[in-house]
């Protein structure tokens, strides 16, 4: 998928280089500041959940580092222009296309599967922890949210 930012065309190509950039720039950090290498999975979840900031992050990451950095406003304008090109009234066609491209990319698919494995481990931890949690409602909510996220991601992969 391509977006136009000013006079530049920014191509979003789900290859090894983008996978590396996403993991480098969007991964969470452990207590020591090291990367958890979960950026691809987190980005995929944001795409599946139709989080608009994920589109902005993708455009900014795909812009050449040699050229002027892309601002949030420029990325949002590029999304608006793409919506006009697609004659779309909402962002669903963009999200759907990006989701499909991520699923079709071997690099991204592998990382997403690892992310789901980590979420499933976290779910086991949440369930065990909920047995002794003081706030049962919050614990149950966290479990339900994590189960829903796993379900949405697995559905998108199938």
Question: Model-found features: residue ranges?
Answer:
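Charged interaction scaffolds used for protein-protein
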Residues: 1-6, 29-46, 53, 65-158
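Short, extreme N-terminal segment that most often corresponds to the first beta-strand
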Residues: 1-25
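Alpha-helix-centered segments that form part of catalytic cores
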Residues: 56
């Amino acid at each position: 998928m391509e977006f136009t930012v000013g006079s530049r065309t920014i191509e979003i190509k789900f290859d090894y280089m983008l996978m590396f950039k996403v993991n480098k720039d969007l991964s969470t950090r452990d207590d020591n500041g090291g990367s958890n290498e979960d950026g691809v999975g987190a980005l995929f979840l944001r795409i599946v959940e139709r989080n608009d900031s994920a589109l902005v992050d993708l455009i900014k990451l795909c812009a050449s580092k040699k050229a002027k950095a892309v601002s949030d406003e420029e990325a949002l304008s590029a999304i608006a222009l793409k919506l006009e090109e697609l004659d779309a009234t909402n962002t669903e066609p963009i999200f759907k296309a990006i989701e499909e491209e991520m699923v079709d990319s071997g690099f991204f698919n592998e990382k997403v599967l690892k992310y789901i494995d980590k979420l499933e481990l976290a779910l086991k931890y949440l369930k065990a922890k909920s047995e002794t949690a003081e706030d049962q409602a919050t614990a149950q909510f966290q479990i339900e949210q994590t189960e829903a996220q796993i379900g949405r991601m697995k559905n998108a992969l199938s």
